[in-house]
Amino acid sequence: VTVLVFGAGGQIGQELLRSLSGRVVCAVTRSGRLPNGRGCVQADFGQPETLRALLDAQRPVQVVNAAAYTAVDRAESEPDVVFRINAQAPGVIAHWCAEHGVPLVHYSTDYVFDGQGTSPYGVDDPVAPLNIYGASKLAGECAVRAAGGCSLILRTSWVYAAHGHNFLRTMLRLGAASECLRVVADQIGTPTAAGLIADVTAQLLMEQVQSRHAGIWHLTAAGQTSWHGFAEEIFVQAQACGLMMRVPQVQAIGSVVYPTAARRPGYSCLDTTALVEAFGIVLPDWRQGVRGVLDEIVNRSR
């Protein structure tokens, strides 16, 4: 086995299988099956102590951890489960990788920040998560870094894809059934296609990740918008590519009008300059990612 991918059935995981299609890959999911029904290796992040035996059996040369608990609001009601999956499990994986000299790529989130900033956050800016999900991902970062070894932690944001549960797919579903939608306009971030994250990850792995690369990096598309702006762009492009005959009116609202169990940062854009300069990576505008995902949905429906 060359590359072991935890969370291969998720949004980023499925895209990783595409990006790494030229490599020997061991796919790992919670159910032991991929979305296409094919069998794969099973792992339960709710039982972190079992992961070491799995890694011993597979002996990967590189590891990517795309598994996570990502239900931000539900996380508020079951913090023990969330921390096992998002903090303890990555720590076990990172320790195994450090002991065996295996590079690890682990994903984190913009929600480690409190959103009080007004310009893109750098990797060394102070962290102060507002919710259980963000706190668990920060604990995961700390666990991975404490293990030592060659671990790259890629913080990303507002992830979406043509598959899975995400904002873009939710908007398409609601927009087809409604003439008017109300969407939060006072949370600012960068929508980032899972395919972009996977492609950059594959490039990093191909560059033979070295210990000097270890640490935290920020990886998002370029630009910024609000959830309201994201929704409007989705509908404009969906109509342009023939996915929707009519588009709903999108009304901008404040977060106070749409209360959620978990508090979210008002501003969570990430500064990707370090990643771009260190690896020569080109990060396209976020709107380009929307177009690519909508094109994929159109092609799948044919």
Where are these regions (language model features)?
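Mid/C-terminal beta-alpha module of Rossmann-like enzyme folds, strongest
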Residues: 200, 207-260
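Catalytic helix-loop patch of NAD(P)-dependent Rossmann-fold dehydrogenases
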Residues: 84, 88-92, 112-154, 158-159
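Amphipathic terminal alpha-helices
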Residues: 284-302
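SDR active-site strand-loop-helix element
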Residues: 6, 28, 63-67, 104-109, ...
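N-terminal Rossmann NAD(P)H-binding glycine-rich loop of SDR-like oxidoreductase domains
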Residues: 1-22
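Adenosine-cofactor binding site in Rossmann-like domains, unifying the SAM/SAH pocket
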Residues: 26-50
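NAD(P)H-binding glycine-rich loop region in Rossmannoid oxidoreductase-like domains
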Residues: 42-85
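NAD(P)-dependent short-chain dehydrogenase/reductase
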Residues: 145-189, 194-203
